[in-house]
Regions:
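Active-site-adjacent pocket scaffolds in enzyme catalytic domains
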Residues: 1-92
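C-terminal domain-boundary segment and adjacent tail
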Residues: 27, 63-167
């Protein structure tokens, strides 16, 4: 099984194909990149979180969600960085993909309030550069790395797929 990975896999409708595929590599454009029968999969971090235990015994499962029950914290940040998918040839780049399930109203206070502001302040003071991007922009960055781009730059955000017409 693949966990915490970035790779291309055939789109056959069979869930077992998700367990195999072609890993993304810096400077290498696989033939399946433009194939309509392949998907580019970017996993969110999945890991055992031994710092947060259920009933004080069992580790909780980290699944990269941001909710009131699972707000961003410095401990989760360190876990995300430790287990984040990386690209072969660019191990210094970690892709921490988080999700909010459409930001339902019960999570608004966490997403827009002091918890998120404190977290953003925390990560700004770390030695790791952080870029907040959309899914489209992340795919563009991945394709730019495949095409041999070096350090992160804003033009990478529109490298392969341009912004929608309304932007």
């Amino acid at each position: 099984r693949r966990v915490n990975a970035i790779y291309y896999t055939p789109d056959t409708g069979d869930h077992r194909t998700l367990a195999r595929g072609v890993p993304l590599q810096a400077g290498v454009v696989p033939s399946c990149r433009e194939a309509h029968d392949h998907l580019l999969l970017v996993h969110g971090v999945t890991a055992l979180n031994w710092g947060r235990r259920k009933w004080g015994v069992l580790p909780r499962l980290e699944n990269s969600d941001l909710t009131m029950a699972n707000p961003p914290t410095p401990d989760r940040w360190r876990l995300w960085l430790r287990h984040a998918p990386r690209i072969a040839g660019r191990p210094d780049w970690a892709f921490v993909k988080l999700h909010t399930h459409g930001a339902p109203a019960p999570n608004c206070d966490m997403l827009l309030g002091p918890q998120m502001r404190n977290f953003r302040h925390f990560i700004q003071n770390q030695s790791v550069p952080v870029h907040f991007v959309t899914a489209r922009e992340m795919v563009n960055v991945l394709h730019a790395v495949e095409d041999g781009s070096g350090d992160f730059a804003t033009p990478m955000l529109d490298h392969h797929y341009g912004p929608p017409p309304c932007m």
